[in-house]
Amino acid sequence: MATFSQKPAEVVKKWVLIDAEGLVVGRLASLVANRLRGKHKATFTPHVDDGDNVIIINADKVVLTGKKYTDKKYYWHTGHPGGIKERTARQILEGRFPERVLEKAIERMIPRGPLGRRQMKNLRVNAGPNHQHEAQQPEVLDVAALNRKNKGNA
């Protein structure tokens, strides 16, 4: 019997809604990365975009454990000599785009390549409680109920 290999035409995608309020960033990011890749399905095929579409709301209310809120640094380079820049997680969460902390955590758990970039397009992260995808009738996924450690104590 040959190993099952799913074709792109056979893929069935669902829409999943996750409320990130009070959830630990890393635990939520690993669960979402697995959903985006499709690894939670028995039909997972490494070279096919088999994952679900994920909508995350309240991304500005995520929790970082330990001292990561003040100590974790996000680096980027401007491209100019000496152009290394850094911001702490606190500065980003209190800044203009607080959802980027969660986006970066998920992005860094997905393989970097053409398929990974396509899978990241199936992710929608909103800082507030609203989203524009009611028409897709997303299924609500209660991440806090999956494991007691998923809920932060902040």
From Swiss-Prot:
Membrane spanning stretches: none
Pfam families given in the database record: Ribosomal_L13 (PF00572)
Gene Ontology MF: a single term: mRNA binding
Keyword Secreted: no
Ribonucleoprotein is among the record's keywords: yes
Gene3D superfamilies attached to this UniProt entry: Ribosomal protein L13 (3.90.1180.10)
Keywords: Ribonucleoprotein, Ribosomal protein
Function recorded in the entry: This protein is one of the early assembly proteins of the 50S ribosomal subunit, although it is not seen to bind rRNA by itself. It is important during the early stages of 50S assembly.
NCBIfam families hit by this protein: rplM_bact
Subunit relationships: Part of the 50S ribosomal subunit.
Name of the protein in question: Large ribosomal subunit protein uL13
